[in-house]
Amino acid sequence: MKFLTLNTHSWMEEDAEGKFQTLKEQILKAKYDIICFQEVNQEIETSVVDTDAYYHALPSATPIHQDHFVRLLVEKLAEEGLQYHWTWAYNHIGYDHLNEGVAVLSRQPLTASEILVSDVDDPTDYHTRRVAVAETTVDGREVAVASVHLSWWDKGFQEEWARIE
């Protein structure tokens, strides 16, 4: 099984477009079975777009926007012949202008769910944390994977981790 996890800090880094291209090229080269991303962002004010059947929406999902990091990445990968199913768990507003969350991508169809692990469930509170869970198959074996971005050790991590267990 080829697995990648990465805190993308999407659209917040210097040379974000260059890093996006580097990531796309690495995925095309490695052809990961499963990918988990954290800090997957989209601007709050950009236009909402339609999604295709490869996107598996969760109950907490805010609409997907034109600049959604994973949507764009999956679209570019598909143009190169590499298709991924994906889901995104929306957590909270980041830096006053971003919808931020965690994502799971799978080369095989997936069943998506989420777990609220924080004490709060308020998108305006950066303490809000959800885990994106995907059940899928890899090499004929059923697997469950989770994309997790928990609080700092002394700011809620232990309680959040206990809710996952």
Say what each PLM segment does.
Residues 1-98, 141, 160-163:
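N-terminal, active-site-proximal structural segment of metallo-dependent hydrolase catalytic domains
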Residues 82-87, 109-115:
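Short secondary-structure junctions
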Residues 21-22, 120-121, 128-132:
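Alpha-helical scaffolding within the catalytic cores
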Residues 1-4, 97-102, 106-112, 126-147:
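Beta-strand-turn-beta hairpins that frame and shape the catalytic cleft
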Residues 38, 43, 106, 116, ...:
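Conserved residues at the C-terminal ends of beta-strands
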Residues 10-15, 122-124, 154-157:
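Short, flexible loop segments at the rims of nucleotide/cofactor-binding pockets, characterized by
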Residues 89-93, 118-123:
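Short, P/G- and charge-enriched loop/turn segments at secondary-structure junctions
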Residues 140-165:
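Active-site beta-loop-alpha substructure in enzyme catalytic cores
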